[in-house]
A protein has these predicted regions:
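Bacterial N-terminal signal peptides
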Residues: 6-15
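Short, positively charged
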Residues: 6, 30, 188-189
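Active-site-adjacent loops and short helices of periplasmic peptidoglycan-processing enzymes
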Residues: 18-159, 169-172
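Positively charged n-region of N-terminal signal peptides that target proteins for export
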Residues: 1-5
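Penicillin-recognizing serine hydrolase domain
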Residues: 21-24, 98, 124-265
């Protein structure tokens, strides 16, 4: 019996190790890009929902450049309808304004909305992914490769904690008028109101100006957050946490450590 129990415990520990997502983290100065903390920051990992930061960056630039309009109506495809959760609940043939799709993707992390954004801008998700990769190169996100607009696990769809930190900083720098989307606890997404998947972090960590969550089994729980204290701003990125509670604690700890360092300079 003792041998069987020992074998079971060993097997359980091995299973936990096999399915544990790799950990990575980075903290950068939001204004200067200076690295304040890093751990496995250049390891290429599954981004999960943080993919939507790239999707939204491309979409915001498409609006600003006149390629599409914020109130343009997007027709929903069967592909978008069939995306797995999290989702808004879009139906094939339905028409909805782009602004609502952006809200659903940014706040709820809706996969169906993300695919609809991609198809609305470029006609297909594959074409939009090529655009995402082009923007990534322009932004210096050299270790990222994007295959889809939502972040569901796909071979070769990878990024790093460093690239995500620089991308989120670019959001606040390049599209300040849209950055409030990442701070909304709830928002009207056209079909219904949706709740922010990062709401606990936004509510409980003072100074959080914006946050984006992601989760898949391959990625674990991950987040990117912009936090400000006094006149100092940082971007905190964590990959591979075991739970949202662990993720939030890690962000809070890294934020405290970074601000303590900045204050004493």
């Amino acid at each position: 019996m003792r041998l069987l129990l020992t074998c079971f415990v060993v097997a359980l520990l091995c299973a936990t190790t096999i399915f544990a997502a790799p950990y990575a983290a980075i903290v950068i100065n939001a204004d200067t890009g200076e690295v304040l903390h890093e751990e496995n920051a250049d390891t290429r990992l599954h981004p999960a929902g943080l993919t939507k930061l790239m999707t939204l960056y491309v979409a915001f630039d498409a609006i600003e450049s006149g390629l599409v309009e914020l109130d343009e109506t997007i027709r929903i495809s069967k592909k978008a309808e069939l995306e797995p959760p999290a989702k808004l609940g879009l139906r094939s043939g339905q028409r909805i304004k782009l602004r609502y799709l952006l809200r659903a993707a940014a706040v709820k992390g809706a996969n169906d909305a993300s695919t609809a954004i991609a198809e609305g801008i470029d006609g297909s998700e594959a074409a939009f992914a090529r655009r995402m990769n082009g923007y990534a190169q322009e932004l210096g996100l050299t270790r990222s490769s994007w295959k889809n607009a939502h972040g569901l696990t796909e071979k070769g769809h990878l990024t790093t904690a460093r690239d995500i930190a620089n991308l989120f900083a670019a959001h606040q720098r390049d599209f300040p008028d849209y950055f409030n989307l990442f701070s909304r606890i709830t928002t009207n997404a056209g079909l219904r109101d949706v709740v922010n998947s990062a709401r606990r972090l936004l509510v409980n960590l003072r100074g959080t100006e914006g946050a984006k969550y992601g989760y898949t089994r391959a990625a674990g729980f991950n987040t990117a957050a912009v936090v400000r204290h006094r006149d100092m701003g940082i971007v905190v990125v964590v990959f591979g946490a075991r739970s949202t509670a662990t993720l939030n604690k890690q962000v809070a700890m890294l934020s405290d450590k970074a601000f303590s360092e900045l204050i004493t300079r």
